[in-house]
Amino acid sequence: GEDRFLREINDAVQIPTIRKDFIIDEYMIYEAKLLGASCVLLIAALLDTETIRQYKAICDQLGLSALVEAHDEAEAASALAAGARMVGVNNRNLKDFTVDIHNSTRLRELVPRNVLFVAESGIKTAEDIAELVSAGVNGVLIGETSMRSPDKARMLDELRSRV
């Protein structure tokens, strides 16, 4: 999306927002702060461990949270080695776009319980959320399901019904 969308959303809501983008330069972190984001997404598939560590340090200096996204064991290990306090597991394989929400339940076992754990992508039902919560997931990122829903408020109510 466009940067202005993040600013418009921040002007309209009183809850934290995330810049869910392909952060590939530290400039984008400063830009996220100026746009009003509370958090940025750092994708381990795009960034090596040292870069994640450096970007996370910039986030800390700016008062931003960093959600470090992983899809597999190696990426989760990189996120943790970089000092991530919040790890997101993308259930969508970015190489072939297949989705498996059990990716989150499998990788949850590798992430210490004192690290916030977020399941991302492929979450469609309240039952999906209940299964993830029972596996120790602390939060979910829901994108496509909400974007495709004609009645977003009702869809969110249904998803929250089991949590």
Map each language-model feature to its residues.
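Glycine-enriched alpha-helix->loop->beta-strand junction motifs that scaffold or abut catalytic
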Residues: 12-15, 34-40, 60-64, 81-88, ...
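Glycine-rich phosphate-binding active-site loops on the catalytic face of alpha/beta enzymes
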Residues: 31-51, 88-97, 137-155
